[in-house]
């Protein structure tokens, strides 16, 4: 089981991420047995990524300083064959974000793009009403557009929501399950992106490893929601569920 594999391998995941979710991401990776490092200064990111198993680039609180660090770290990771994950948070909310994501996609070869449907719309230029960094409203053919995006950038595209869609441009599938409480707190999607980095780097079949990751992340959400109905406790419950899954495997899925 992929979460157990992550615990066994203990990959170091370099996260250049946003300050809203950095603590939650770090604790989520630790819950699975991975090691997080959140370095984002341009003076050290190339050195730091060189000792990591994967790099996460998350643009949630984007600024010029972290933009430079993202480009440096991403290019270095490409040189070293280290997988890079992109979380284009709120990509369609502003021109600055959209232009930055385009630059990142042009200059860096990403292994995975993990987004919601509003962010997917921004990446493929489909009209969409973005609501800040949240998904917003509109219509998009997720299967078609995600597949074309995966083919264009030669990567795996994961579009998360009530149901998750994943494709590498050839094979694809939907993953169901989860719980709506995950949308009522910040950071659950951002944490998933970090976990995708840990999963991608923990075996020889990244596609299958990511399918399993999405499946068991939804199982973790179900376990967490079964533990509490109080929204203030859901993040803690999710961390506990991830920890249990990484130690006990599928046995812990029995509610």
UniProtKB/Swiss-Prot annotation:
Its cofactor is Mg(2+). It catalyses: 5-(2-hydroxyethyl)-4-methylthiazole + ATP = 4-methyl-5-(2-phosphooxyethyl)-thiazole + ADP + H(+). ATP binds at residues 114, 160. GO terms for biological process: thiamine biosynthetic process; thiamine diphosphate biosynthetic process. Transmembrane segments: none annotated. Substrate binds at residues 38, 187. Its EC number is 2.7.1.50. GO terms for molecular function: ATP binding; hydroxyethylthiazole kinase activity; magnesium ion binding. It comes from the Bacteria. It is an enzyme of class 2 (transferase). Keywords: ATP-binding, Kinase, Magnesium, Metal-binding, Nucleotide-binding, Thiamine biosynthesis, Transferase. InterPro entries: Hyethyz_kinase, Ribokinase-like. Pathway: Cofactor biosynthesis; thiamine diphosphate biosynthesis; 4-methyl-5-(2-phosphoethyl)-thiazole from 5-(2-hydroxyethyl)-4-methylthiazole: step 1/1. NCBIfam families: PRK09355.1, thiM. Catalyzes the phosphorylation of the hydroxyl group of 4-methyl-5-beta-hydroxyethylthiazole (THZ). Belongs to the Thz kinase family. This is Hydroxyethylthiazole kinase. It comes from Lysinibacillus sphaericus (strain C3-41). The gene is thiM.
């Amino acid at each position: 089981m992929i979460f157990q594999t992550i615990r066994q391998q203990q990959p170091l995941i370099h996260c250049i991420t946003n300050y809203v979710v950095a603590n939650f991401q770090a604790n989520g990776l630790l819950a699975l047995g991975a090691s997080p490092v959140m370095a984002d200064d341009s003076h050290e990111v190339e050195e730091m990524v060189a000792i990591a198993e994967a790099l996460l680039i998350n643009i949630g609180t984007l600024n010029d300083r972290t933009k430079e660090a993202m480009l440096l770290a991403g290019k270095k990771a490409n040189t070293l064959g280290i997988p890079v994950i992109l979380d284009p948070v709120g990509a369609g909310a502003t021109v600055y974000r959209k232009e930055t994501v385009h630059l990142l996609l042009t200059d860096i070869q990403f292994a995975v793009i993990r987004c919601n449907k509003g962010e997917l719309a921004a990446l493929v230029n489909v009209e969409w009403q973005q609501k800040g960094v949240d998904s917003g409203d509109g219509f998009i053919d997720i299967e078609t557009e995600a597949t074309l995006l995966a083919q264009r950038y030669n990567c795996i595209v994961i579009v998360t929501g009530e149901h998750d869609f994943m494709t590498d441009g050839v094979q694809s599938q939907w993953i169901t399950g989860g719980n709506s409480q995950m949308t009522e707190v910040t950071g659950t999607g951002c944490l998933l992106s970090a976990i995708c980095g840990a999963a991608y780097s923990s075996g020889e079949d990244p596609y299958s490893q990511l399918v399993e990751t999405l499946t068991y992340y939804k199982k973790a959400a179900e376990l967490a929601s079964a533990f509490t109905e109080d929204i203030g406790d859901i993040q803690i419950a999710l961390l506990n569920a991830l920890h249990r899954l990484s130690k006990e495997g599928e046995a812990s899925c029995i509610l």
